């Protein structure tokens, strides 16, 4: 394919612009850029076949997806363990609070004491167990076998485990209902069966709402980019219109010879000047909206330095003109003085050279 025909205006350019907008967002290319640089356009089209919408290569994107999948899997496992750990801690805290206010039954006391003992021994066993990088002395001088002896009886553990499952399920159920009522306050008056049905689909609802939020955020970003482009275009068009109006006003000023016409011309001139000032004010307003205060201040500094340099050059030029006028006023007498000074300078140089040679000969 010829380079001149690669990016001819049409559907090919539109397709390439869409590809660049999705896969190469920092480029911000225009249709004119693609038409004027066909080889670069061909390079972008070739690169688009090897990268995804985020700009990553397909291989790297696949590896990243696998890594994120592994991270999500490990995060899910950790969250399950962390949730169970926190629920058990909350059960123990509730037990301590109830023990201060009410008299608990013997079964409740036995359940919480067995749970606390089992949890404490398990944590100490993990701290003193293998799997550490460096050899550390036993915790408090206790070996793993010493800690295992502190475990509650097996029949108590089996009974506690069966009840713990019910307690954890009830605690998680209350938390799920609380989350559901926070997300949908109207569900507060529903029955447990209806709440359980809504909780079952709550995950899908949250995922769908999150996806909608992400899509809305992406659309908002695209709209902001489009709005910025339109704002720049409208500002440029408005500036051209203001310049055209100013030129038309200056070209069509009325000029008359009579006094009345002169007064009318002065009035129209003042009116045009006011209009020009107003147009200038609008132009400055558009420029202030287009350029930031830092850019305006930088332009002002550059202009001040250039004006200062111009003034210095004009002063040097004026001094040079004065010296030139002085030399021109002297005329032929000044030229004779220059020739005489040149002869004396040459004679002095010759005598100085002779003295140097004589001194060398004497040494």
UniProtKB/Swiss-Prot annotation:
Q: Which InterPro entries match?
A: HAUS4, HAUS4_met
Alphabetically ordered keywords of this record: Cell cycle, Cell division, Cytoplasm, Cytoskeleton, Microtubule, Mitosis
Query: Which residue stretches, if any, does this entry annotate as coiled coil?
Result: none
One Pfam assignment: HAUS4
One Gene Ontology cellular component annotation? mitotic spindle microtubule
Quaternary context: Component of the HAUS augmin-like complex. The complex interacts with the gamma-tubulin ring complex and this interaction is required for spindle assembly. Interacts with EML3 (phosphorylated at 'Thr-882').
Q: Which GO terms describe its biological process?
A: cell division; centrosome cycle; spindle assembly
Q: Where in the cell is it found?
A: Cytoplasm, Cytoskeleton, Microtubule organizing center, Centrosome; Cytoplasm, Cytoskeleton, Spindle
Which species is this UniProt entry from? Mus musculus (Mouse)
Function as written in the Swiss-Prot or TrEMBL entry: Contributes to mitotic spindle assembly, maintenance of centrosome integrity and completion of cytokinesis as part of the HAUS augmin-like complex.
Protein's recorded name: HAUS augmin-like complex subunit 4
Q: Which family does it belong to?
A: Belongs to the HAUS4 family.
The answer to whether keyword Hydrolase applies is: no
